[in-house]
């Protein structure tokens, strides 16, 4: 009465995502980030802040779930050396999150993307690939606050 109503005749979301709605249109709890990822971020942060005990606690929570009851599968990480612990955390991220498409961004964040990718025979990586271009519309809206990332100007 006095207003128009538009009903879409097709869905624009992924069918798997549409299954996550209840019959009342509310979201069901969709997992956007895994708890193991959160724990590994905590481990990395604690290690970089020089708190190895906390880093090991986070790391061991992830490894304990993976090892189950067989402690021979994954021995406990006991090193408190920051460099060694950093490598253990990085390796755990590699195996725990291996098929979740975060590896490249981890390598970039750690500043080792070129080294690791070239060692794996992926020689088309360039330093400019560490950053993505900013959308020009966002740069324009910022009125000079944002500038385009290097190599994309």
What is each PLM-predicted segment?
Residues 3-4, 8-153:
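Acidic/polar-rich alpha-helix caps and helix-coil junctions
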């Amino acid at each position: 009465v006095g207003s128009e109503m538009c009903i879409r005749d097709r869905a624009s979301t992924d069918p798997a995502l549409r299954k996550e709605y209840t019959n009342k249109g509310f979201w069901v709890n969709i997992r956007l980030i895994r708890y193991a990822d959160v724990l590994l971020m905590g481990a990395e942060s604690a290690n970089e802040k020089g708190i190895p005990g906390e880093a090991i606690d986070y790391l061991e929570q992830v490894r304990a779930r993976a090892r189950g009851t067989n402690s021979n599968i994954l021995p406990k990480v006991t090193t408190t050396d920051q460099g060694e612990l950093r490598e253990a955390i990085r390796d755990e991220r590699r195996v725990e999150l291996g098929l979740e498409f975060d590896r490249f961004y981890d390598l970039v964040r750690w500043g080792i993307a070129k080294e690791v990718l070239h060692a794996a025979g992926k020689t088309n990586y360039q330093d400019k690939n560490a950053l993505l271009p900013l959308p020009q519309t966002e740069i324009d809206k910022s009125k000079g606050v944002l500038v385009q990332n290097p190599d994309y100007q």
